[in-house]
């Protein structure tokens, strides 16, 4: 492949994988650190939050493009936190890692048993839809 074509292909690939600010919350530290590391490898700036209180504190400190509520958070947390996200930062997208979420403040849900590759694809699609 000619150098100009390689450069063009690289630019279009990196344009589709733009860096976003993600707040990722879980109740299990091991899950939180492992999943956050994968998101960081994909090029996202990830802030982690442990439990509901951690998510609330992070929302008070900063604004995010996307808030991901992980599967180890309680059902109650996954229900109430989307309201808090939208109230704190109206334009922030909310992705819940739970197969059966139907919530009007949630922008997308994904089954947490899917591979990290599929989760990263869902993140990219959700962000691309807002541009």
What spans do the regions from the language model cover?
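Conserved acidic segment of CheY-like receiver
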Residues: 18-29, 35-39, 67
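A generic structural motif
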Residues: 42-46
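Acidic phosphotransfer microenvironment of two-component signaling modules
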Residues: 29, 50-54, 114-117
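Conserved phosphotransfer cores of two-component systems
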Residues: 60-62, 84-91, 100-101
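Acidic, metal-coordinating helix/loop segments flanking the phosphotransfer/catalytic sites
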Residues: 48-66
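Output/docking surface of receiver
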Residues: 95-131
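CheY-like receiver
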Residues: 41, 57, 83, 87, ...
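Conserved phosphotransfer microenvironments
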Residues: 68-86
């Amino acid at each position: 492949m000619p150098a100009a074509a390689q450069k063009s292909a690289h630019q279009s690939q990196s344009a589709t994988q733009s860096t976003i600010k993600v707040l990722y919350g879980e109740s299990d530290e091991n899950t939180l650190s492992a999943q956050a590391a994968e998101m960081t490898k994909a090029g996202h700036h990830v802030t982690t939050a442990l439990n509901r209180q951690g998510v609330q504190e992070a929302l008070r400190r900063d604004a995010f493009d996307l808030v991901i509520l992980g599967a180890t958070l309680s059902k109650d947390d996954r229900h109430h936190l989307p309201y808090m996200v939208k109230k704190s930062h109206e334009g922030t997208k909310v992705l819940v890692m739970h197969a059966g979420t139907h919530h009007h403040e949630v922008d997308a849900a994904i089954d947490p048993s899917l591979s990290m590759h599929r989760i990263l694809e869902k993140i990219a699609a959700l962000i691309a839809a807002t541009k």
